[in-house]
Amino acid sequence: MRHYEIVFIVHPDQSEQVPAMIERYRTLVTSNGGTIHRLEDWGRRQLAYPIQKIHKAHYVLMNIEVSQEVLNELEHAFKFNDAVLRHLTLNTDEAVTAPSPMMKEEKSKSLLAKDEAAAPAPAPATEQATA
């Protein structure tokens, strides 16, 4: 079996259905003897250029290990799902399990937001009148 990295972009109006789509694709991979090494839901992001007059879309990344038949079936499912605007499949040499740069960026943003919320606001300086 070979290792693949797949990114697919879902129409923003179908964002509520993304968890069900992920689960459907996950069962397709695992039921046929494949394994999922990394699965990341990047959420709704700005597109680099409009696709079908759409400027934002929902991104999902999968790193999987499957046979060619399962990959063909998965790409067929992407092709005939109207909610999937684009998909890209890359062949990788080995399983990638580390968080992607996109997820590292999200975690750092969320950690910064938590730190700012947790840090107490500095007390306002009070002036003392000297007589």
Curated annotation (Swiss-Prot):
One CC-aspect GO term: cytosolic small ribosomal subunit
Region (Disordered): 96-131
Keyword Ribonucleoprotein: yes
Function: Binds together with bS18 to 16S ribosomal RNA.
Entry's family note: Belongs to the bacterial ribosomal protein bS6 family.
GO biological process, one term: translation
Biased composition (Basic and acidic residues): 103-117
Protein name: Small ribosomal subunit protein bS6
GO molecular function: small ribosomal subunit rRNA binding; structural constituent of ribosome
Lineage start: Bacteria, Pseudomonadati, Pseudomonadota, Betaproteobacteria, Nitrosomonadales
Low complexity composition bias: residue spans: 118-131
Organism: Methylobacillus flagellatus (strain ATCC 51484 / DSM 6875 / VKM B-1610 / KT)
Keywords: Ribonucleoprotein, Ribosomal protein, RNA-binding, rRNA-binding
Keyword Ribonucleoprotein belongs to the record: yes
Alphabetical list of Pfam families matching this protein: Ribosomal_S6
